[in-house]
Amino acid sequence: MAFTTPLTAHGYSYQAAYIKAHIAHCDAQRTVVKLTVWPTQADRENGAEPVRYDNDLRQYQTDLNLQADNPVAYAYTLVQASGEFIDATWNV
């Protein structure tokens, strides 16, 4: 599970950055999601190192009523619902 989106990170622009999300912290009040970015999906699949992305943490209010199959799906649902990545292609 991942998404692609145009992204600028550390002075470089990526047309279809490949981004994976996972929960870094979660409690009853907040959920912190860490994003890991590669230039492309092919780079990720070929074992390339992630790009430097200093803006990699997102904090959201924990929604105990939000339905998700697992913690990873919950993280992606929060990121998608935030509206930050409006040009993203989800579930790649």
Which residues are covered by each model-predicted region?
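Viral virion structural and adsorption modules
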Residues: M1-V92
